[in-house]
């Protein structure tokens, strides 16, 4: 009788069909069926990190505009003091040498203490941006500024002729909650997890021409 009750109980359960997906080492149980990966369409790069934004962010001394975490909402960039390799330390940073040389983001010495903690993929190619952490309802966006800081990921399509706004719109249509990228209403993206993320079949139209099957 106990076994019979157990079987009857199973029959009354509301079953929810899921797909078991392994993607770049990530295990997912998804409702949707995903046929390709973002890496088939594009590659993802991380933004630059200064390790001392209060010193490098300056409307007065800055020499480059950077897409930052607030750009998705405001459309505005942040003026930063960028130090290119081979250039001498900017005069405005000289008083802060002791602090900058002790930043822990990477090793610094007398030859590089004024450099940023992490660089970024510098390219004139069109790209889509997304904050690594955001509550924006449409997190993927385009901006003409080619520089981006560490709060932002840049998505470069393999096909340089692909309209990036089309790519952004397509990515904004994906059910990222089903793919495990939403926690407490906030999108959480990393370079690797986003690049390896499965994508639904309709995005196959964005594949480079040689990859379309």
Give, region by region, the residue ranges found by the protein language model.
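A short beta-sheet element
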Residues: 132-167
């Amino acid at each position: 009788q106990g076994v019979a009750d157990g079987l009857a109980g199973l029959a009354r359960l509301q079953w929810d069909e899921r797909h078991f997906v392994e993607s770049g080492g990530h295990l997912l149980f998804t409702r949707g069926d995903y046929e390709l990966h973002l890496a088939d369409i594009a590659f993802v790069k991380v933004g630059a990190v200064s390790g001392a934004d209060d010193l490098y962010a300056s409307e007065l001394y800055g020499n480059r505009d950077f897409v930052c975490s607030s750009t998705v909402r405001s459309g505005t960039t942040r003026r930063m003091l960028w130090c290119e390799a081979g250039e001498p330390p900017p005069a405005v940073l000289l008083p802060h040498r002791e602090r900058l040389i002790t930043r822990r983001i990477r090793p610094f010495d007398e030859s590089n203490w004024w450099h940023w903690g992490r660089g970024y993929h510098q390219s004139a190619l069109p790209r889509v941006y997304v904050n690594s952490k955001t509550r924006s309802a449409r997190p993927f966006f385009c901006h003409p500024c080619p520089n981006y800081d560490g709060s932002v990921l840049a998505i470069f399509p393999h096909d340089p002729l692909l309209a990036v706004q089309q790519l952004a719109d397509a990515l904004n249509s994906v059910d990222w909650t089903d793919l495990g990228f939403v926690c407490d209403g906030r999108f959480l993206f990393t370079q690797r997890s986003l690049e390896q993320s499965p994508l639904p079949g309709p995005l196959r139209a964005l594949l480079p021409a040689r990859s379309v099957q």
